[in-house]
Design a protein with these regions (language model features):
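Cytosolic regulatory regions of ion transport systems
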Residues: 1-259
Length: 259
């Protein structure tokens, strides 16, 4: 059940289970519902509760923590990860055969290689080239080790600038607070900014329009390692992100709702 109302989704799943549905999944965006219902959701007849914003926040946080990763997906209760990497000139993976890859990183599986417009299902005879996008799968622990070995020249993200203080920002801050980064959020609505400031005392909250280039310059956008645009308007997110790239911010993440 994925209606805009959490209560309707939960009730629909309860009813569906009583009518014989074997599996029921409810989209629940309110974190309070997720916390209170999790302990007894199965007895109510809800097999799984999903929170799109929370999952997005976790993905964004992982991308920030591991700058070389272009995308990351988790499976098996977050114990298995599929990551996408672009092979750079100075990467130890450049010009490596998959036979050599298997010898060196035996616990990691190369699932796919994307080379320009071509998608390659790899065999041992394939060679990884500069510019390839490779998709590798492994346990969470082995992926972390693999990342450290292959991204040793990558500078860790120490500071993050976020524009927009919506629900996704709250979830993202919940995750990032454990990463020991300097975080600044620019939010144009006073009430939301004050609530963020009260909820996250270690995060610097600025009242202003984060899509205004003058404000971004004033807040020192060029000094940040990562920039995340989470306003409610796709066009504003894209324009702000392009400006961040012009300012040589290392990692830029943009929220786009429209496909």
């Amino acid at each position: 059940a994925v209606t805009p109302q959490d209560e309707v989704n939960i009730m629909a799943c309860i009813l569906a289970q009583k009518l014989g549905a074997k599996y029921t999944i409810a989209r629940v965006r309110n974190p309070e519902y997720s916390k209170h219902f999790e302990s007894f959701r199965e007895s109510l007849g809800v097999s799984l509760m999903i929170n799109p914003e929370m999952e997005s926040a976790r993905s964004i946080a992982k991308i920030i923590k591991f700058p070389n990763i272009l995308s990351i997906q988790s499976f098996a209760k977050d114990q298995v990860e599929l990551i996408e990497l672009e092979v750079q000139k100075d990467s130890p993976l450049a010009n490596m055969s998959l036979n050599d890859f298997r010898t060196r990183y035996g616990e990691i599986l190369v699932c796919t290689i994307r080379r320009k417009s071509e998608t390659i299902i790899p065999s041992g005879q394939n060679t990884i080239r500069v510019g390839d996008h490779i998709y590798v799968l492994g346990s969470k622990a082995t992926i972390r080790k693999f990342y450290k070995k292959t991204s040793w020249k990558t500078k860790d993200v120490q500071s993050v600038l976020i524009i927009g203080g919506g629900r996704l920002t709250y979830y993202l801050l919940d995750v990032l607070k454990d990463y020991h980064m300097a975080i600044k959020v620019i939010e144009q609505h006073r009430e939301i900014a004050e609530d963020l400031s009260a909820s996250y005392p270690n995060v610097e909250i600025i009242l202003g329009d984060g899509t205004d280039q003058d404000i971004l310059i004033q807040e020192g956008i060029e000094n940040y390692n990562a920039f995340v645009s989470l306003t409610g308007v796709d066009e504003e997110n894209i324009i702000a992100s392009l400006y961040a790239l012009q300012q040589s911010v290392d990692k830029v993440v943009t929220k786009v709702n429209r496909e």
